[in-house]
From Swiss-Prot:
Identification of the protein by name: Putative endo-beta-N-acetylglucosaminidase
Coiled coil regions, renumbered to chain: none
Family annotation (InterPro entries): Cell_wall/Cho-bd_repeat (IPR018337), Glycosyl_Hydrolase_73 (IPR051056), LytB_SH3 (IPR041074), LytB_WW-like (IPR040742), MGlyc_endo_b_GlcNAc-like_dom (IPR002901)
Subcellular localization(s) per the UniProt record: Secreted
Originating species: Streptococcus pneumoniae serotype 4 (strain ATCC BAA-334 / TIGR4)
Gene name tied to this protein: lytB
Amino acid sequence: MKKVRFIFLALLFFLASPEGAMASDGTWQGKQYLKEDGSQAANEWVFDTHYQSWFYIKADANYAENEWLKQGDDYFYLKSGGYMAKSEWVEDKGAFYYLDQDGKMKRNAWVGTSYVGATGAKVIEDWVYDSQYDAWFYIKADGQHAEKEWLQIKGKDYYFKSGGYLLTSQWINQAYVNASGAKVQQGWLFDKQYQSWFYIKENGNYADKEWIFENGHYYYLKSGGYMAANEWIWDKESWFYLKFDGKMAEKEWVYDSHSQAWYYFKSGGYMTANEWIWDKESWFYLKSDGKIAEKEWVYDSHSQAWYYFKSGGYMTANEWIWDKESWFYLKSDGKIAEKEWVYDSHSQAWYYFKSGGYMAKNETVDGYQLGSDGKWLGGKTTNENAAYYQVVPVTANVYDSDGEKLSYISQGSVVWLDKDRKSDDKRLAITISGLSGYMKTEDLQALDASKDFIPYYESDGHRFYHYVAQNASIPVASHLSDMEVGKKYYSADGLHFDGFKLENPFLFKDLTEATNYSAEELDKVFSLLNINNSLLENKGATFKEAEEHYHINALYLLAHSALESNWGRSKIAKDKNNFFGITAYDTTPYLSAKTFDDVDKGILGATKWIKENYIDRGRTFLGNKASGMNVEYASDPYWGEKIASVMMKINEKLGGKD
């Protein structure tokens, strides 16, 4: 009985749908339909062979029109006139629906390049996930899926392939889309397939053959966008090295296992070549190929001297080296001792090094006999009859009677023996540039006044000159009536002479007083003195700015910079914008000299340094080795005199206002 009932219900459903309904040759009376047997159709489908369409006759015997009909899980749509919609789109309440060839509304399905959702409505401007294809699609405003194009959706860019599939975790030209399909914006990306990092720029494309600055470091992206790592890059006429993490090597050492050598990379990442580097409390030299000099000799054309670099590249200084079956000595500045005497405090003996730096032995040099070990056999360097001595080391200190340092003087300077004070085997009482003190005998070499040059002063009738070397003189004052033209005068302080006292107009001038010259007048100095190619030219305004800000005389600043930098034309001036010799130590002037960013900063920065280290400490005038700036600023005992001479020369050219 149950089986018969089930078959009956199924038959009723079948007959209630278009598939189960049968064609009829009945007639229409308005919206009603009379079947062939004359009965009135109701609650059933009718196929009219004349109109070739299905109609649905409702319970009130009228056909359904402009409305939906649900039968089971299916929906049908009856159009105006009662025709059943099939294989077509129907618009209802602003939405579109698709009825298939059987008239059923499609749901969760593709219709061409359109998609209808769970309600049957066509999807518009929304995402669609199709589990059959395991892919995402996007339906645009026109109801069609995106295809072979980029779309920006809610601020993110997506790419859709042929067929509308969303591209994920792949490259598309120079762009990359992540696992969610969004185009990767600015930042790093690691691609496992290529086992490399890439950098995506702000425009969404990967960086290619270019530098990127990120989080305080530079990186280089090669052709194809691959990040350079553990490799060299040639760019901007220099080599650069990208470390294992891709960061550019900068201000650091790098060991290259391929060449088995160390290299140094400066600020900006440039490989150092033909250059010195101060690091680890030592000097190192990087050769023309960038490799560190190690266990070898290097000739530096700038200083015109040989240097030796030990294992690890450390510069040898104050040390002996055995090489080429001879001993060599590297001085405190690292230069090879050559054609000179060297006192070794360890063995407490003098040695002589010939041309090429070879140590002399078993021979006589300048009348002094050297033994088989190279030591001088002649005993003392002093001479009881000598009145003058010359400084032997690069610099040597002058001490008071208690052994406290008073000042220091440069190699080659000539000191007077002060016979009014006691000297002994270890120290000599001397006088130089106004300073009286004591110097170690080992730092001095006796001079023969009848043969050796002794500094002197002389007047030509117009100017009074200080001859500090045989071919070098400094005009220090105007001729005085008490002076005898052509006569050589000698003075231990440069002020007191036989028959007169010299008044140097600028040597003891208070440098905290402003000059009477304007910036424009200071600029004229270069043309008046015929000085060309100077970095200091037209910098009068900067000198005056320094004067106003730091209260230091601008004329002095110009003269000081002129002396130290050869009027802004020296190598240190050109390479480092250092015009005042700041930290240009006697042993390593170029290497140790401070670097300034530009000319103006070189002038202003040095003025600030001078104020803090000299003016503010009471040394407000140039002076000599007894007082003033010259005591500590320079080892040259006549440094102050030389600057004062330049000031005098400029003052005369500009009209004598100071």
